[in-house]
From Swiss-Prot:
This is Small ribosomal subunit protein uS12. Residues 110-122 have a biased composition (Polar residues). Gene3D superfamilies: Nucleic acid-binding proteins. The modification 3-methylthioaspartic acid is found at D89. One of its GO terms (cellular component) is small ribosomal subunit. Part of the 30S ribosomal subunit. Contacts proteins S8 and S17. May interact with IF1 in the 30S initiation complex. The keyword Transcription does not apply. PROSITE patterns: RIBOSOMAL_S12. It comes from Methylacidiphilum infernorum (isolate V4). The gene is rpsL. Belongs to the universal ribosomal protein uS12 family.
Length: 141
């Protein structure tokens, strides 16, 4: 426990907050090149083949980033935009690839529907707004 005089002279040291996405260097997004596109299996209670890519960022750091949505067109040497945000059941995956920018195309619709266009959560998957003349999706009865 410091004395009052020591506190007057030095003061207390502020606790530094650790960043959750250190490879971005305090930037909201970073551009990068896909080095390898692969699938990973999630942690214990879950089972799937999650699509991920190893990306070399413009600052020279290599990270593993998740490819959200269903279906993708990424391959080696694709240019992508990476944001922070971890995937809870994939250890070591702390970044997401932004769909609909650079070489990453927008996602197609969910597989539990028979339509190929995504109408909900479009902004998260880089899907453009449907044309005004297009017929609306049929409602299940």
């Amino acid at each position: 426990m410091p004395t009052i005089n020591q506190l007057v002279r030095r003061g207390r040291e502020k606790l530094k907050r650790k960043t959750k996405a250190p490879a971005l260097d305090s930037c909201p997004q970073r551009r990068g090149v896909c080095v390898q596109v692969m699938t990973r299996t999630p942690k214990k209670p879950n089972s799937a083949l999650r699509k991920v890519a190893k990306v070399r960022l413009t600052n020279g750091k290599e990270v593993i980033a998740y490819i959200p949505g269903e279906g993708h067109n990424l391959q080696e040497h694709s240019i992508v935009l990476v944001r922070g945000g971890r995937v809870k059941d994939l250890p070591g995956v702390r970044y997401h690839i932004i769909r609909g920018t650079l070489d990453a195309s927008g996602a197609v619709g969910p597989s539990n529907t028979n339509k190929l266009n995504r109408n909900v959560s479009r902004s998260k998957y880089g899907v453009k707004r449907p044309k005004a003349g297009a017929k609306p999706a049929s409602k299940a009865k």
